[in-house]
C-alpha cells in the first residue's frame, strides 16, 4: 500500500471514504484513555492535521499511548467520513508503527509560543503552525513570481552573487576575500594589495543583480532575476536584513510607465495566486495574525494604484498638519512614517511615488528634463510602506558618465556597464521587489526575521 498525503485526503476526501489508507507523519498531539486514544498527525503536505483514532485492540496500544509529540509514525487504517463531527473525517487505525522517537524535552509543546522564542529555535520553527503557514506561502509566492514572468515571455537570468561593482553606489557591501587577515599583502602605498586576492581585485557580495540583468535585457528584451542579495547595513529594524531575496525585472524599450504597469500587475497576480492556492494558511493569518488582512489584500487587488510625483507627495505631507518624527521638506528621502501617512490616511490604497530628487537616488536612474529629479518610482503599500523601487535607466552615455563623476564612482569598475550604451542602446526600465517585504504584506507578519528561514541580521548569523 502506497502512502497518501494529508493534502490528498483533504482535497479528495470523498474519494477515500471507506478505503484503507497508509499515512506517515509526525505526532502533533496525542491523548489516550485506558481503552482508546486520539493522535493528530501531520506529514508536512498540508496546513491542517488528520485525526487518528486507536484502541486497545492494537497489540502495541500501551506503547502508542506513550508516544511523544514530534515522534514519527506510520498509520494504516480505514479512512472514515464523519460529517456530523467536529472534524470532517478521521482514520481508524488498524496498525501504527513508530518510525522515530522524540525526546521528552521537545521544545514545541502544545501551547502558543512567542515569535521571539521561535526565532531562537529556527531549526524547529517550521513545525509550528505559524511558520508552517509562512513558509508554505513563501513557496507559493516564489512560484507565482516565476509563473507571472514566464507567462509574459520574460527570460530568467541568474546573476552573480560575487561582484566587483556596487549597483547602488552606497558602499554598504560585504567583502569576499581569501587573504590572510592577520598579515595581508601590501602594495607600495602600504594599502592592502587586492591583486593578490582570489579574484585579483577587491570583490563583494552583490547588493543587486540589476546591472547584470540590464546586459541581458539588451539582448532578450524582457528578463528577470530572483535571488539573494546582501547589504551590510547596521539597521536593526523589523524591516531590514543583511541577506534577503530580490525580484528584479528589466525591460528594454520600456519607459517609467511600463515599469509601473508591470509592477502593479505583478503584485496583484502574486496576491491572487496565494489567496487561491493557500486558503487555509491565509485564513490562519487573517484570524490569528492580522484580522484586517483579507480586507487589505482585497483592497489592493481591486484598486487602481495611485500615482503622484515626489513633489506632490511632499506638498501633501507639508500641508497635512501632522507632526512627524522626521520633518518634511523637498529633498529628503521619505521615511516609513511619511509613506504610511500617504497610503494609510490619504490614498488608502497602494501608491506609486515618482520623480524623486536625483541626489537621493542611484547613479543609473534617468535624469529628467528639469535636471533635478530622476525617472524613478517607489511603490508604497498600506501598513508597510515601500516594497518596490525602480526607475527608467539612464541610456545616454555622456549623461551617465557625468553622473558617475559627480558621485565619485570609478568608471573603470563599470566599464562593461558603460559599454552597453555604445552598442545599440535603447530606453529601458526595471525595478526591484524585496521578496521578504512582499511576504510580510501577504501574511501580516510584522518582522522580516519571521518570513525568512534563517535570518541574517546585525550581530546574528545563527544556524
Curated annotation (Swiss-Prot):
Gene Ontology terms: biological process: asparaginyl-tRNA aminoacylation
EC numbers on record: 6.1.1.22
GO molecular function, one term: ATP binding
InterPro entries xrefs: Aa-tRNA-synt_II, aa-tRNA-synth_II, aa-tRNA-synth_II/BPL/LPL, Asn-tRNA-ligase, Asp/Asn-tRNA-synth_IIb, NA-bd_OB-fold, NA-bd_OB_tRNA
Enzyme class: ligase
Reaction equation(s) it catalyzes: tRNA(Asn) + L-asparagine + ATP = L-asparaginyl-tRNA(Asn) + AMP + diphosphate + H(+)
Gene3D superfamilies on file: Bira Bifunctional Protein, Domain 2, Nucleic acid-binding proteins
Primary subcellular site in the record, as a coarse category: cytoplasm
Subcellular compartments: Cytoplasm
Keywords linked to the UniProt accession: Aminoacyl-tRNA synthetase, ATP-binding, Cytoplasm, Ligase, Nucleotide-binding, Protein biosynthesis
GO cellular component: cytoplasm
NCBIfam families: asnS, PRK03932.1
Assembly mode: Homodimer.
Family: Belongs to the class-II aminoacyl-tRNA synthetase family.
Name of the featured protein: Asparagine--tRNA ligase
Organism the protein comes from: Clostridium acetobutylicum (strain ATCC 824 / DSM 792 / JCM 1419 / IAM 19013 / LMG 5710 / NBRC 13948 / NRRL B-527 / VKM B-1787 / 2291 / W)
Amino acid at each position: 500500500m502506497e502512502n497518501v498525503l494529508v493534502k490528498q485526503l483533504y482535497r479528495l476526501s470523498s474519494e477515500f471514504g471507506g478505503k484503507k489508507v497508509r499515512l506517515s507523519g509526525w505526532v502533533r498531539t496525542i491523548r489516550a484513555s485506558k481503552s482508546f486514544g486520539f493522535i493528530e498527525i501531520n506529514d508536512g503536505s498540508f496546513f491542517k492535521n488528520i485525526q487518528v483514532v486507536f484502541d486497545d485492540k492494537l497489540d502495541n496500544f500501551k506503547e502508542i499511548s506513550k508516544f511523544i509529540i514530534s515522534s514519527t509514525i506510520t498509520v494504516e487504517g480505514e479512512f472514515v467520513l464523519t460529517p456530523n463531527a467536529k472534524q470532517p473525517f478521521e482514520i481508524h487505525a488498524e496498525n501504527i508503527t513508530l518510525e522515530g522517537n522524540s525526546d521528552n524535552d521537545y521544545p514545541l509543546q502544545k501551547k502558543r509560543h512567542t515569535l521571539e522564542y521561535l526565532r531562537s529555535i529556527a531549526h524547529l520553527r517550521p513545525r509550528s503552525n505559524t511558520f508552517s503557514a509562512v513558509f508554505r506561502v513563501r513557496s507559493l509566492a516564489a512560484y507565482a513570481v516565476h509563473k507571472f514572468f514566464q507567462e509574459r515571455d520574460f527570460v530568467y537570468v541568474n546573476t552573480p552573487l560575487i561582484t566587483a561593482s556596487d549597483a547602488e553606489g552606497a558602499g554598504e557591501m560585504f567583502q569576499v576575500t581569501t587573504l590572510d587577515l592577520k598579515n595581508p599583502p601590501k602594495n607600495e602605498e602600504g594599502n592592502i594589495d587586492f591583486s593578490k586576492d582570489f579574484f585579483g581585485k577587491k570583490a563583494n557580495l552583490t547588493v543587486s543583480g540589476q546591472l547584470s540583468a540590464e546586459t541581458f535585457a539588451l539582448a532578450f528584451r524582457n528578463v528577470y532575476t530572483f535571488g539573494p542579495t546582501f547589504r551590510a547595513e547596521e539597521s536593526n529594524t523589523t524591516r531590514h536584513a543583511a541577506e534577503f531575496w530580490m525580484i528584479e525585472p528589466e525591460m528594454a524599450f520600456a519607459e517609467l510607465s511600463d515599469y509601473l504597469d508591470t509592477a502593479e500587475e505583478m503584485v496583484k497576480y502574486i496576491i491572487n495566486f496565494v489567496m487561491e492556492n493557500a486558503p487555509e494558511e491565509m485564513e490562519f493569518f487573517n484570524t490569528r495574525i492580522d484580522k484586517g488582512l483579507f480586507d487589505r489584500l482585497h483592497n489592493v487587488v481591486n484598486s487602481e494604484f495611485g500615482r503622484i510625483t515626489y513633489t506632490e507627495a511632499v506638498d501633501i505631507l507639508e500641508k497635512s498638519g501632522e507632526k512627524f518624527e522626521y520633518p518634511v521638506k523637498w529633498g529628503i528621502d521619505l521615511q516609513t512614517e511619511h509613506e504610511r501617512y500617504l497610503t494609510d490616511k490619504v490614498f488608502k490604497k497602494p501608491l506609486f511615488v515618482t520623480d524623486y530628487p536625483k541626489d537621493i537616488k542611484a547613479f543609473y536612474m534617468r535624469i529628467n528634463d528639469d535636471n533635478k529629479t530622476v525617472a524613478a518610482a517607489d511603490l508604497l503599500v498600506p501598513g508597510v510602506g515601500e516594497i518596490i523601487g525602480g526607475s527608467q535607466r539612464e541610456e545616454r552615455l555622456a549623461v551617465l558618465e557625468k553622473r558617475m563623476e559627480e558621485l565619485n564612482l570609478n568608471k573603470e569598475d563599470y566599464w562593461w556597464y558603460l559599454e552597453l550604451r555604445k552598442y545599440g542602446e535603447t530606453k529601458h526600465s526595471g525595478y526591484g521587489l524585496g521578496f521578504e517585504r512582499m511576504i510580510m504584506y501577504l501574511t501580516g507578519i510584522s518582522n522580516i526575521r519571521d518570513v525568512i528561514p534563517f535570518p541574517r541580521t546585525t550581530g546574528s548569523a545563527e544556524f
